[in-house]
Amino acid sequence: MSQSCMFCPKDELPMEPKLPKGYEPHDVEAKWYEFWTENGLFHADENSPKNPFSIVIPPPNVTGVLHMGHALNNTLQDILARWKRMDGHEVLWQPGTDHAGIATQNVVEKQLAAEGSSRHDLGREGFVDRVWQWRTESGGQIINQLKRLGASCDWERERFTMDEGLSRAVREVFVTLYEEGLIYRDNRLINWCPRCHTALSDLEVEHQDQKGNLWHLRYPVVGTDRHLVVATTRPETMLGDTAVAVHPEDERYADLIGKFIMLPLMDRQIPIIADEYVDKEFGSGAVKITPAHDFNDFEIGKRHDLEFINIFDESGVVNGNGGRYQGLERFEARTRVLADLDAAGLLEQTEEHLNAVGECYRCKTVIEPYMSLQWYVNVQPLAEKAIEAVQTGQTRIIPQQWEKTYFEWMFNIRDWCISRQIWWGHRIPAWFCAACNEVTVSREDPTACSHCGATELRQETDVLDTWFSSALWPFSTMGWPDKTVALEKFYPTSCLVTGFDILFFWVARMMMMGLKFMGQVPFKDVYIHALVRDAQGQKMSKSKGNVIDPLTVIDEYGTDAFRFTLAAFAAQGRDVKLSVDRIAGYRNFVNKLWNASRFALMNLEDFDPSGIDLDDCQLTLAERWILTRLIDVAAETGKALEEYKFNEAASVLYAFTWHEFCDWYIELSKDDLYGEDAARKATSQAVLYTVLEQLLRLLHPLMPFVTEEIWQALPGERPAVSIMSAAFSTVSELPEDRQGASHMERIMDVIKGVRNIRGEMNVPPGKRIAAVLDCKTSKAAEVMAAGEGYIKSLARIDDLAFGVAVERPAQAATQVAGDIEILLPLAGLIDLDEEQKRLNKEIAKVEKDVLMFSKKLSNESFLAKAPAAVLEKDRQKLADAEEKLSILKQGLEKLAALQ
């Protein structure tokens, strides 16, 4: 082995003894993921005495391919899982996939169509076998992609919603709810997809605003020369009209209530009824009523005992109830009906109208309200407890703003249509008796009718809504309905990380089912993350061409850079605006850490970290500062993760790593590391080792691969087989010096001030200069005395004078750093006249840029035609040029003051 190690992994540690010059993510990621899995580091021990932390993955569809939503969701979950594992918890991250009924059936049906076949050719059993075959061959793609993301799920426990154990749980829940009268069968209006030939819940219907028409139709009143005008966006449904409604207080139609309309094209009389649903101020104040094809009309139809006439078949084709329009597809029927009404002089007006059209969430076919016999869950009693659980804090929803959305839906919840007319899914465990027509619902397949004892039974052909089995996910995956050790240890789960788009589909239903069947909430926290959009805040879509593929990004920039980017932009309640440039920026961060680690390792070759006790060391001011800052960063990172503020954790770690550790401490340590004082060098090595080793632990949940690679390359024995098994932080054992840290930061402010002046005045960076520090207090002078060596070294100063009321040099550029004024004598350093000429020349150039971009961005034609990305880039260029111009002018003013 390249390292000695206190633990004995199954294989040699898969790494070189030293870090190569460049970081190659692909090779590093593959070897460490294999190492973690082969050594069982993701596995949750249900018999462990450690406190549990459990989280269930929102199971991706078995048809799925990793997209940005998956990437964000699973990165955040993995950060939590790795952090809690390192923080001493027994972590179960439960993985699995969803059978995705309609989606998977569509995929396999397309395959069959390409082969010139169909599911009907195979028959139900043959088709289901074919889907299982597809799942075996292709269904694991999304899981392999999650592994590339670094997901530390317990893959030994991977579940599938059609697994035998989960299927048993589904049947138990269905039968129990049926026995309690909460599941029932009813003939009512549902959302119907004419393409998928199945019912859809309200949540499975996506509404899109579409430009269409509002047609005003004339309906003759029987026995008079009057007519009523009704407006509709779906004129074909008039074939099923069974009434015209007016408001009971509408005086215009008071004398017509109770009379009849002669329904055009159908020669059928329908009544004029009064109902308060009608808005008498909208349109003519008269509304056509089609109870079998409109949800509002359905309720009116029930109130007035109207006839329900279904005019379509399951494919959206007009049936025998449509008279002469029988056999026409619904939109063909619309065209024909409008033409015939127009010919009869009954089409009064056509106006443009923006309409919210409901579409199937899977195939995007326009849905049809359709009368059908379906299975339902009465969710009202279940919802009451789920509402109470959030109200009383048993479950927290984070950010809290989503609680309002949750309550609004739950307080207005409607019964859940759970039956689907497809073949792939959990078949409803109900059997119909040929003898008595009664239904038998059973945990086991029955051999006889539970009502009359007859043996000729036919099982329900419908399957359950995919979300029915998903609603049981937190406890069915742990072995329910059996009382398992896993359930005892890990239920209720600690948190759920999910997108807001499935708050109702999934989260609310898990709440209801968990409380019903486990007597406890399924999770203590629900963290709802935002959407990943493009750099301009636009939703990613193939049609816009702005989709960023996670796997392409991982291949190009590495998983760690990608993960850190997602975390850095995952602010609560704010969508992630993602661009490839930002990911490239965080790749630079990974490289910065890599290069700093290479520097450290080169200076730790002769160092043995065993027995480090920094309390016994004579620490410099810089060392006390970096250790104190490390203690604070560890606390801030842990607090941010505890509060699901992933962006704050990333920000704290980024700033400390890049600026404080790499830019400052490494530079501050070089004199000691390169010096002749052996004791001083040993202490400097001990601090460098400690800070880097602890920093890698803090970074690991966000950047698991590069941190493992570097951590394993550190000298000495490792305290664990992997960094992911090490403690998240042991900084509580480190010495801290608050006053010393404060003094060091004042010294650093002075160094930054000197550097700023050098930059503004164009003093060559390598040129050693003189400086004067006018201290306003004796305490400030004491601090400067303590930091004299640092200031001279890092600010490249040969002659440094400081004190209270110190003599001020002539022709000096100045800057204030707190209670210290920095003065840099410029005489002999630069030619003031030449510098003034240079600045004027640069100002003229930048002013041209500002003028050019200003004109461009005030051009209405350009603004109207240019893509959003181009506009954004030009606006940024203008802002950068204006900022540069301001800095140059300030520099010129300072020069003028010196002359």
From Swiss-Prot:
Pfam families: Anticodon_1, tRNA-synt_1, Val_tRNA-synt_C
Function statement: Catalyzes the attachment of valine to tRNA(Val). As ValRS can inadvertently accommodate and process structurally similar amino acids such as threonine, to avoid such errors, it has a 'posttransfer' editing activity that hydrolyzes mischarged Thr-tRNA(Val) in a tRNA-dependent manner.
E.C. no: 6.1.1.9
Keywords tagged on the record: Aminoacyl-tRNA synthetase, ATP-binding, Coiled coil, Cytoplasm, Ligase, Nucleotide-binding, Protein biosynthesis
Gene3D superfamilies, A to Z: HUPs (3.40.50.620), Isoleucyl-tRNA Synthetase, Domain 1 (1.10.730.10), Valyl-tRNA synthetase, C-terminal domain (1.10.287.380), Valyl/Leucyl/Isoleucyl-tRNA synthetase, editing domain (3.90.740.10)
Protein name: Valine--tRNA ligase
Gene that this polypeptide is encoded by: valS
Main location group: cytoplasm
Record note on quaternary structure: Monomer.
Motif interval(s): 'HIGH' region: 60-70
Localization of this protein: Cytoplasm
Catalytic activity: tRNA(Val) + L-valine + ATP = L-valyl-tRNA(Val) + AMP + diphosphate
Residue ranges of coiled coil: 827-898
Organism of this sequence: Syntrophotalea carbinolica (strain DSM 2380 / NBRC 103641 / GraBd1) (Pelobacter carbinolicus)
SUPFAM superfamilies for this protein: Anticodon-binding domain of a subclass of class I aminoacyl-tRNA synthetases, Nucleotidylyl transferase, tRNA-binding arm, ValRS/IleRS/LeuRS editing domain
GO terms under cellular component: cytosol
Domain description: ValRS has two distinct active sites: one for aminoacylation and one for editing. The misactivated threonine is translocated from the active site to the editing site.
